[in-house]
Amino acid sequence: MRFALMVTGPAYGTQQASSALQFAQAVLAEGHELSSVFFYREGVYNANQFTSPASDEYDLVRGWQALNETQGVELHICVAAALRRGVADETEAKRLGLSGANLQHGFTLSGLGALAQAALTCDRMVQF
C-alpha cells in the first residue's frame, strides 16, 4: 500500500510530529511505500535546522532527515507557511534579504501542488 503523510504539528510542543515519524517508520518496516511527507502550518518547524533539543531528548528534525537519507522519502515543506514562520532555504533567504537560511538538508520548499500530487498518487493520506 502506498501512503503519504501531512504533518501540521511542530517538532516540539505537541505529539503530532513524533507520532507521524513513528507511523512513517512503522509503515516502511511493514513493507509499505511512503511516497512523501508534506509539512504544513506549524509542521514547517520540523525543517528548522536551528532547532536544538536538550541532550536527553530525541532530535526530531534530524530524525526526519534520516528518513529522507535512508529511505528516500520526500520531505516537502509548504513554502508560504515556512516563510511566514521564518524557515527559508538559500534562494528564498537571498530573495528576501534575510541574514541566512535555516532549512534542514533533506527538506524541500514546495507549493500545495506537491500535497495535491501526493494525494492523487497514494492509497492512503494520513494527517497528523
From Swiss-Prot:
InterPro entries: DsrEFH-like, Sulphur_relay_DsrE/F-like, Sulphur_relay_TusD/DsrE. GO terms for molecular function: sulfur carrier activity; sulfurtransferase activity. Its EC number is 2.8.1.-. Gene3D superfamilies: DsrEFH-like. It comes from the Bacteria. Part of a sulfur-relay system required for 2-thiolation of 5-methylaminomethyl-2-thiouridine (mnm(5)s(2)U) at tRNA wobble positions. Accepts sulfur from TusA and transfers it in turn to TusE. Belongs to the DsrE/TusD family. HAMAP family: Thiourid_synth_D (MF_00390). This is Sulfurtransferase TusD.
